[in-house]
Amino acid sequence: MEFYTPNIVRVSKTLESGNVNLRKSLAVVLEPTQVEVNVSRQNDMVKASSSLLEVILDLNTGRVQFSNLDGSKLLTEKDYGVQLMPLQYVQRIREKKVESHVAGEVVPTQSAPGQNTPGLDRGKMRTIVENTYEVSQSFILDEDEVIYGLGQQQTGKMNQRNQRLVLEQNNMQIAVPYFASVKGYGLYWDNYSITTFDDTPMGTSFRSEAGEAIDYYFLYGGNGDATVALLRQLSGQAPMVPLWTLGFWLLAV
């Protein structure tokens, strides 16, 4: 667990012991700031408190719980709710040769399996092996808690409870692994592989096909506007389009 700000906490979990350096995020631009955190331990419970947020880690089950300073629970992980299943992805690619436009030297390039580009010599096949994990984390939300987000989904629903959504980019379907709760917090799941969001009476989970670790950010703003501001602080501020462009857009293909 790491406090990036007094109300933004990063949670990472791996199967490795000791300090593990994860890859630099492609989406998160915020760097950790100097945050005063009070840490205490009672038996298997470790509590870390900033000026705005309290986080409790159960060393026995690995469960993380987020609360505000008056003790009201915001979000709780499910007991033993983390899964990291080792996987190995194998891809065969063909190296082809093409003349450089700069100096005329021959340089190797890569193409997808079965791709046949005219004018290029067929090269040798090469195998790429990547060891990774299928990663999953489950949470417990209040029964009547409403959450928004997860991108542009064609379900006709605003509240994303009681749904199973596959988060991948498709025409008219934009996936964003982030949801915001009416309780004033947001959760950003930092993973770029195909991810399944699943909410049932048994729990709420993100499951990604590939990842080196469980990696997510908890943001507590207290209300929707403040939480969106924290997300912009975390991932960068996208400029608004000019006022004259707002209105009805139509693209006919």
Spans of model-derived segments:
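A low-complexity, Ser/Thr/Gly/Pro-enriched, surface-exposed linker/loop concept
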Residues: 2-46, 84-87
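Catalytic and substrate-binding clefts that recognize carbohydrates or anionic sugar/phosphate headgroups
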Residues: 41-253
